[in-house]
């Protein structure tokens, strides 16, 4: 695969724009940052039909896209083995094609949900309690997310804090919080934004406040934000319980996706030993 250049960028964005639900982060990062972000790198591969595979590395993890099959993966696998990303995300079919060839990774699958733009046309309960967070709040936000059993395994507090600050500074994302008793009790964020859409993520409530309605207040708040700004709202879900709840809440499955997470070194060695 060849390194993407500034000259490649317009046609790559046009290529991705045709299938946005299956390449949301890849498109948003390239649209906002171009190729100037020091924490990013991007590659592409072409064939007789034109652009085929696009790969992007952001803070170490990979996002992949291609609108054709991934049977020929030699150059991509070479890139993955060279860069050793801790995580790889792509549409489901791509992850299914790569997983058997990457035994040091564990596969997980989920769906991309899109919410109706008119869902949250009216103010929701608790809006007066919600504040947009600033960089001074980032360490506490990162600690709260990393303490969550599901979300926390994807990040380290320091690495997540760096990403959150970068999103705030560049306009790629915003965080919103509810404070109680001098601390952040709940948080939601837009983890990526561009003119067409936003991706909501990082919705977490401190264990001491799980009996509150904060989860629903923040979920409604970010839906209102998307509606006011005329953007589609997307979210990614792997938990079947959350999926059932969200499907009842006027969200449609827009795409299926998968992710590969690199196994800890001990797990990899045990598997190689034939256990």
Language-model features: locations:
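Acyl-donor (CoA/ACP) binding surface of acyl/acetyltransferases
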Residues: 175, 183-199, 208, 215-216, ...
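Active-site rim helix/loop that mediates acceptor-substrate recognition in acyltransferases
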Residues: 21-39, 153-175
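Conserved acetyl-CoA-binding loop-helix of GNAT-fold acetyltransferases
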Residues: 70-76, 205, 211-225
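Helix N-cap/beta->alpha junction signal
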Residues: 5, 91-92, 134, 239
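Conserved donor-binding loop and adjoining core beta-sheet/short helix segment
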Residues: 1, 20, 28-83, 186-201, ...
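Short amphipathic alpha-helix that is part of the acyltransferase structural core
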Residues: 1-24, 119-155, 266-275
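Acyl-donor-binding surface of acyltransferase catalytic domains
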Residues: 58-126, 235, 242, 254-265
